[in-house]
Amino acid sequence: MKITQEEVTHVANLSKLKFSPEETAEFATTLSKIVDMVELLEEVDTTGVAPTTTMADRKTVLRPDVAEKGTDRDRLFKNVPEKDNYYIKVPAILEDGGDA
């Protein structure tokens, strides 16, 4: 499946990203190759293979979920330029963002 430069530009605009025409062309080519690879994988016969089967021989190793004392809030907010009731205020980046 071919991804067009127009589609890349459309998604970039939705994401508030700007790309040069060269970058847009490169992204379109790269994304088309990725979609082609996924389409190729869809052709693999997985009959009888459990959905949770993996080819990797690894197990997920997670650390214990133990609560730890965090950093002092006032110390964290010491260098924050604009705050409101322990929320960091940042400029709105979306149109009609209001006071978000």
From Swiss-Prot:
One of its GO terms (biological process) is glutaminyl-tRNAGln biosynthesis via transamidation. InterPro entries: Asp/Glu-ADT_sf_sub_c, GatC. PANTHER family: GLUTAMYL-TRNA(GLN) AMIDOTRANSFERASE SUBUNIT C, MITOCHONDRIAL. Allows the formation of correctly charged Asn-tRNA(Asn) or Gln-tRNA(Gln) through the transamidation of misacylated Asp-tRNA(Asn) or Glu-tRNA(Gln) in organisms which lack either or both of asparaginyl-tRNA or glutaminyl-tRNA synthetases. The reaction takes place in the presence of glutamine and ATP through an activated phospho-Asp-tRNA(Asn) or phospho-Glu-tRNA(Gln). Coiled coil: none annotated. Pfam families: GatC. Its EC number is 6.3.5.-. Belongs to the GatC family. GO terms for molecular function: asparaginyl-tRNA synthase (glutamine-hydrolyzing) activity; ATP binding; glutaminyl-tRNA synthase (glutamine-hydrolyzing) activity. It catalyses: L-glutamyl-tRNA(Gln) + L-glutamine + ATP + H2O = L-glutaminyl-tRNA(Gln) + L-glutamate + ADP + phosphate + H(+); L-aspartyl-tRNA(Asn) + L-glutamine + ATP + H2O = L-asparaginyl-tRNA(Asn) + L-glutamate + ADP + phosphate + 2 H(+). The keyword Nucleus does not apply. This is Aspartyl/glutamyl-tRNA(Asn/Gln) amidotransferase subunit C. Keywords: ATP-binding, Ligase, Nucleotide-binding, Protein biosynthesis. It comes from the Bacteria. SUPFAM superfamilies: Glu-tRNAGln amidotransferase C subunit (SSF141000). Heterotrimer of A, B and C subunits.
